[in-house]
């Protein structure tokens, strides 16, 4: 390679990933086929517009690629409509929100510190800057969504749009209850399933596709695809909405919001990678993979509970859980730094009603999607949990060095996808 500096850095990242236990809930490992597609010659092609409606010539091949990705996404989720062009989940959310409501309208989303996402109404996001944002949270007692409280807040603020979904919530969300609430206040419903898309596609969690007006997702995380976004619609795809002072079908409004509304040319090499990932997710072994993700996550959570830790909401229904570090008297930031020293990666995370600054936090978030992609089973996951607990409890530098050696020896025996 001519650029030896850059490619040496890439090799360093290869080594880091191979010798590291990856517990960040929003990360995963793609297949070699996905990497091949994303690293292909398709990165050369500019293709503003949509299949058969491009602003450039020479798009007949990428038209077929995007159409294939759309077809597979629709099949995977049982959707009537799919847009595979969003570059990220945040951009998918921006386009979906703008297709349904206009700037200044009211939105109701999950409080960020209770497990929501920046794009669900945070003041530092477009969703809180350009819209009148309100929030709902979890019950102080159960640390789960209180749907009666959501209904009460919705009736008080009368939102134009309700967003259901989360980035650090370990329980299954009842999308039908959210739709009932939305209908009661004449609001649209947007479901953001970025974290649980793989569980929904395989039937382990209830699907919002025919419940919500629009559903958004990322294509990485539990879908094991390239980093990117996705917008889906079911039976509501052809309803008429007021977009840009014109009556449009919802799917047409979404298309316009993605391009030219929020993006220019699509990333055709990434869309090809999405197509590969959707095909892989349609295979029977992907359902087995998701089953193992859930099993591994539960096993780790149970291990922490048995060691005296408090798990937010008492457990997990999906691929992640939150650990309250109060028993140790350390912060999430402390834990993140210590664990990185022993080749374990996760992230500090606020817990509901957290008294600490978001840059410090009282908890950590742990996910099993990535380690499961490397072939770890339930017993392996319990061993991983013990590595984490050992590192968090020790005060010895020598013990941390030993844990790091143990971690490298253990995880290096599992192949990268």
Swiss-Prot record:
Residues at the site labelled Plays an important role in substrate specificity: 220
Classification via CDD domains: SHMT
Cofactor: pyridoxal 5'-phosphate
Entry EC number(s): 2.1.2.1
HAMAP family with a match to the protein in the record: SHMT (MF_00051)
Catalytic class of the enzyme: transferase
UniProt keyword annotations, A-Z: Amino-acid biosynthesis, Cytoplasm, One-carbon metabolism, Pyridoxal phosphate, Transferase
PANTHER family for the chain: SERINE HYDROXYMETHYLTRANSFERASE (PTHR11680), SERINE HYDROXYMETHYLTRANSFERASE 1 (PTHR11680:SF35)
Role: Catalyzes the reversible interconversion of serine and glycine with tetrahydrofolate (THF) serving as the one-carbon carrier. This reaction serves as the major source of one-carbon groups required for the biosynthesis of purines, thymidylate, methionine, and other important biomolecules. Also exhibits THF-independent aldolase activity toward beta-hydroxyamino acids, producing glycine and aldehydes, via a retro-aldol mechanism.
GO terms, molecular function: glycine hydroxymethyltransferase activity; pyridoxal phosphate binding
Chain positions found as N6-(pyridoxal phosphate)lysine: 221
Quaternary structure (record): Homodimer.
The protein's annotated pathway: One-carbon metabolism; tetrahydrofolate interconversion; Amino-acid biosynthesis; glycine biosynthesis; glycine from L-serine: step 1/1
Pfam families: SHMT (PF00464)
Gene Ontology annotations of biological process type: glycine biosynthetic process from serine; tetrahydrofolate interconversion
Family: Belongs to the SHMT family.
One GO CC term, this protein: cytosol
Residue positions binding (6S)-5,6,7,8-tetrahydrofolate: 112, 116-118, 247
InterPro entries found in the cross-reference section: PyrdxlP-dep_Trfase (IPR015424), PyrdxlP-dep_Trfase_major (IPR015421), PyrdxlP-dep_Trfase_small (IPR015422), Ser_HO-MeTrfase (IPR001085), Ser_HO-MeTrfase-like (IPR049943), Ser_HO-MeTrfase_PLP_BS (IPR019798), SHMT-like_dom (IPR039429)
Record field: catalytic activity: (6R)-5,10-methylene-5,6,7,8-tetrahydrofolate + glycine + H2O = (6S)-5,6,7,8-tetrahydrofolate + L-serine
Protein localization: Cytoplasm
Primary localisation category: cytoplasm
Name of protein: Serine hydroxymethyltransferase
């Amino acid at each position: 390679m001519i650029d030896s500096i850059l490619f040496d850095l890439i090799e360093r990242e290869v080594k880091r990933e191979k010798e590291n236990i990856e517990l960040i809930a929003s990360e995963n490992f793609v297949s070699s086929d996905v990497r091949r597609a994303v690293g292909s010659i398709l990165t050369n092609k500019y293709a503003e517009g949509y299949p058969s409606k491009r602003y450039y010539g020479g798009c007949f091949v990428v038209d077929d690629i995007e159409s294939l990705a759309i077809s597979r996404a629709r099949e995977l989720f049982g959707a009537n409509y799919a847009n595979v062009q969003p570059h990220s989940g945040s951009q998918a959310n921006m386009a979906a929100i703008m297709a349904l409501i206009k700037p200044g309208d009211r939105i109701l989303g999950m409080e960020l510190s209770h497990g929501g996402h920046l794009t669900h109404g945070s003041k530092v996001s477009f969703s809180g800057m350009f819209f009148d944002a309100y929030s709902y949270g979890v019950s102080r007692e159960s640390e789960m969504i209180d749907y009666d409280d959501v209904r009460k807040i919705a009736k008080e603020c009368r939102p134009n749009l309700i967003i259901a979904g989360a980035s650090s919530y370990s329980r299954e969300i009842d999308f039908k209850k959210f739709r009932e609430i939305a209908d009661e206040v004449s609001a649209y419903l947007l479901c953001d399933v970025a974290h649980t898309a793989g569980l929904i596609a395989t039937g382990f969690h209830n699907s919002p596709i025919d419940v919500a007006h629009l559903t958004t997702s990322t294509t990485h995380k539990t879908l094991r695809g390239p980093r990117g976004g996705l917008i889906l619609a079911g039976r509501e795809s052809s309803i008429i909405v007021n977009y840009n002072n014109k009556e449009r079908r919802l799917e047409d409004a979404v298309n316009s919001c993605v391009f030219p509304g929020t993006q220019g040319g699509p990333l055709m090499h990434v869309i090809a990678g999405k197509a590969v990932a959707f095909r892989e997710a349609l295979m029977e072994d992907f359902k087995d993979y998701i089953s193992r993700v859930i099993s591994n996550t539960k096993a780790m959570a149970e291990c922490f509970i048995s060691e005296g830790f408090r798990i937010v909401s008492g457990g997990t229904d999906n691929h992640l859980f939150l650990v309250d570090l109060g028993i140790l008297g350390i912060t999430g930031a402390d834990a993140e730094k210590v664990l990185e020293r022993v080749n374990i990666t996760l992230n500090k995370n606020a817990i509901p009603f957290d008294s600490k600054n978001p840059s410090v936090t009282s908890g950590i978030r742990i996910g099993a999607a990535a380690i499961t992609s490397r072939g770890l089973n339930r017993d392996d996951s319990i061993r991983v949990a013990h590595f984490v607990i050992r590192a968090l409890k020790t005060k010895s530098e020598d013990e941390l060095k030993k844990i790091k050696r143990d971690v490298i020896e253990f995880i290096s025996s599992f192949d990268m996808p």
